[in-house]
Regions:
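Composition-driven recognition of glycine/serine/threonine/acidic- and proline-rich low-complexity segments
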Residues: 2-27, 31-207
Length: 207
């Protein structure tokens, strides 16, 4: 077994619980950051094939903002936080009082704010995962990319598709005021890290 889709229901439940804990921690931090109450639905944790991801995110030509963090230590790989233009516009309005017409022309302060939001979200899941699996990791400085979904995904997909044709995707839906916004987190582990995850979940790994 060397695919997410091969794991047992009990291991899937652990992944779901990691998603729940990460989401709870993230929404608490975001609410404090923007000083505004945020409601969040139960996260949707999915195991998906690479080729299915662009359609899941609205199509390859949909403009997204991506925040990338690399992991090293007990786990090596990449976390990617993807948000829509609507999500970015809403959060920047709440956080900075900035009305953004085109997310491709954000100033440095707005870019920094989006990076910080991505850091909060990804690190909430990373902390939940490493605590539950008793692992130690180092998280890189985040990087941000604003482009079409297909372009943002192309580099990590080329690299990680050699290792596995599946990834872990976490979808979160947020509600504040009368708005609903959605974000996605992708986790792409290196092959030896996938082996460690399987072992931590009590699953047998076959390379």
């Amino acid at each position: 077994m060397n695919k997410y889709s091969d794991i047992s229901e009990s291991a899937r439940d652990v992944l779901m619980e990691i998603g729940n804990i990460g989401t709870g921690n993230a929404v608490t931090a975001l609410s404090s950051m923007i000083n505004h109450r945020i409601e969040i639905e139960r996260p949707n944790v999915k195991i998906m094939k690479f080729e299915e991801v662009p359609a899941m995110l609205g199509g390859p030509e949909e403009i997204k903002l991506g925040v990338l963090l690399e992991l090293s230590g007990d786990l090596n790989g990449m976390f990617m936080f993807l948000i829509s233009t609507k999500f970015a516009q809403t959060m920047l309005d709440k956080l900075l009082g900035t009305e953004v017409e085109d997310v491709r022309n954000l100033d440095d302060m707005s870019l920094s704010a989006v990076c910080e939001i991505g850091n909060i979200m990804c690190c909430s899941y990373i902390n939940a995962m490493t605590a539950m699996m008793d692992l130690r990791v180092h998280v890189s400085v985040s990087d941000i990319c604003i482009d079409m979904t297909g372009a943002i995904l192309s580099v990590p997909m080329i690299h990680f598709a050699r290792l596995s044709d599946e990834l872990l995707l976490i979808e979160d839906k947020y509600h504040f005021d009368d708005q609903e916004v959605v974000s996605h987190i992708l986790f792409l582990p290196e092959i030896h890290s996938l082996e460690r995850i399987f072992k931590a979940l009590g699953e047998e790994y076959e390379g």
